[in-house]
Swiss-Prot record:
Pathway listed: Glycan biosynthesis; glycogen biosynthesis
The entry's keywords: Glycogen biosynthesis, Glycosyltransferase, Transferase
Designated name of the protein: Glycogen synthase
EC number annotated for this UniProt entry: 2.4.1.21
One of the GO biological process terms: glycogen biosynthetic process
Lineage of origin: Bacteria, Pseudomonadati, Pseudomonadota, Alphaproteobacteria, Hyphomicrobiales
Top-level class of the enzyme under EC nomenclature: transferase
Length: 489
């Protein structure tokens, strides 16, 4: 097995900084690749949380000027992660999230903040750190999308590139007037380069200029080649279909393990499912729900947004209430949705509980205590919460889209008869169909044998990174072999 060295480029990484699933992927993939002969380091921005969380740091390069100020590249570690951290206080030392300020508005200099990340990645790929020259650069989402552009237009030898789309809805578009300031030549602003409807498209750059494209589920790879999910980039994705692959995400099964999870009230496994009820009791107490052990407890852990379909849950509340289902919702996002869910909790105390925000400990407890977990997304590239739900014995109730349809086997008659069902799917993604799915879920819950079969199938499914990592390693090697073949032809 030929050894491969790879640089991952990501705007967030668990456990240092996380706003979504990208962080989980960036944090788990390096360790998963090691058994497949791939050594990966990850380049991340030096946000305050990152600099505070790393365990060691040694400067390996200094930039006198990087988009408005001096910067340093640090070699660092966090647990088992080998990192490069771009320390640029003028770009990253500020409050708020990685992408927006405390007021929720995008940082006005995001074009430079993430161009700096991409340019540094490209320079590492071309020998900036002599002790680490990667064979592959694997860039994630629009924040790293300029990486192949900086490589392509440098005129220098370059490593192979892979670009992964985690969510096509966020594309990183900026004024064309920034082209020269970003250090890109005039020729880069073309339909075959970074130009996208008159702007500079960071996502478009990654899709256009990388050697291979992946996205986080086979179904989403197909969906984004059509106009509904393609978000204006479907034509390009159809054009590059031969270079596009869908590889499912996994979850870190050491972090997400109900038998060892220190964040939950009681640990359990498939042979000791009765211990799970202590977690259900804790969720009910925390969300001020009535302590009725016979009621179905439905969990939601989600950003409150149109994409995530949480407005559809509000439409389906009459059915949820009539079925006697309890709801424990943890999430934040759209202020209107937040207020509507808080109002529902006030109107139906004991049956609906809502906590606005996000808390990792509570997310683990909901997975361990909810009977079912709802993911009603209008589109979902992969989704991780349903994978965690499978692992924890919370039966997933999901919209039949993207990675949700790839990872949850609907409890229809054929799947139940074959003994392979793991959850409930619904389609089309409407309030009425969600309501019907809730009624179906309640009926399944009433059949204890059927419900336990769903839990058993979910908890025995392999949702780890083992298979995805093997697919990525194969992709890297096939790409390097193709390059070698062209070089010797």
């Amino acid at each position: 097995m030929t050894a491969v060295t790879a640089l991952s480029v990501a705007s967030e990484i668990y456990p240092l900084i996380k706003t979504g699933g990208l962080a989980d992927v960036a944090g788990a993939l390096p360790a998963a690749l090691l058994p497949h002969g791939v050594t990966m380091r990850t380049l991340v921005p030096g946000y305050p949380a990152v600099l505070a969380g790393i365990e060691s740091a040694a400067p390996v390069h200094s930039f006198a000027m990087l988009f408005g100020g001096p910067a340093r590249l640090l070699a660092a570690r966090k647990g088992g992660l080998d990192l490069f951290v771009l320390e640029a206080p003028h770009l990253y030392d500020r409050p708020g999230s990685p992408y927006s300020g405390p007021d929720g508005k995008d940082w006005p200099d995001n074009a430079y903040r993430f161009a700096a990340l991409a340019r540094t990645a490209a320079e590492i790929g071309q020998g900036l750190v002599p002790s680490f020259v990667p064979d592959i650069i694997h860039a994630h989402d629009w924040q790293a999308g300029l990486t192949p552009a900086y490589l392509r237009y440098s005129g220098k030898p370059q490593p192979a590139t892979v670009f992964t789309v985690h969510n096509l809805a966020f594309q990183g578009q900026f004024p064309r007037e920034l082209l020269a300031t970003l250090g890109l030549p005039p020729g880069a602003f073309s339909v075959d380069g970074v130009e996208y409807y008159g702007s500079i498209g960071y996502m478009k750059s990654g899709l256009q200029l990388s050697d291979r494209i992946t996205t986080v589920s086979p179904a989403y790879a197909l969906e984004i080649q059509g106009p509904q999910a393609g978000m204006g980039l479907d034509g390009l994705l159809r054009q590059r279909a031969a270079q596009l692959t869908g590889i499912l995400n996994g979850i870190d099964d050491k972090v997400w393990n109900p038998a060892t999870d220190k964040r939950i009230t009681a640990t359990y496994d498939l042979d000791h499912l009765a211990a799970r009820r202590a977690n259900t009791q804790s969720v009910r107490e925390l969300f001020d729900l009535s302590l009725d052990p016979d009621r179905l407890l439905l969990g939601v852990i989600s950003r409150l947004s149109w994409q995530k379909g949480l407005d559809l849950l509000l439409e389906a509340l009459p059915v949820l209430l009539a079925e006697g289902i309890q709801l424990a919702l943890l999430g934040a996002g759209d202020p209107e949705l937040e207020e509507r869910f808080k109002s529902a909790a006030q109107a139906y105390p004991g049956q609906i509980g809502v906590m606005i925000g996000y808390d990792e400990d509570l997310a683990h407890l909901i997975q361990a205590g909810a009977d079912a977990l709802l993911v009603p997304s209008r589109f979902e590239p992969c989704g991780l919460t349903q994978l965690c739900a499978l692992r924890y014995g919370a039966v997933p109730v999901v919209a039949r889209v993207g990675g949700l349809s790839d990872t949850v086997v609907d409890a229809n008659e054929m799947a139940i008869a074959a003994g392979v069902a793991t959850g409930v799917q619904f389609s089309p993604v409407t309030g009425d169909m969600l309501a019907a799915a809730l009624s179906k879920t309640r009926a399944l819950y009433a059949d204890r044998a059927a419900w336990q079969a769903l839990q058993h199938n979910g908890m025995t499914a392999d949702v780890s990174w083992r298979n995805p990592a093997q697919h990525y390693a194969q992709l890297y090697r096939s790409l390097l072999a193709a390059r070698q073949s062209r070089a010797t032809a």
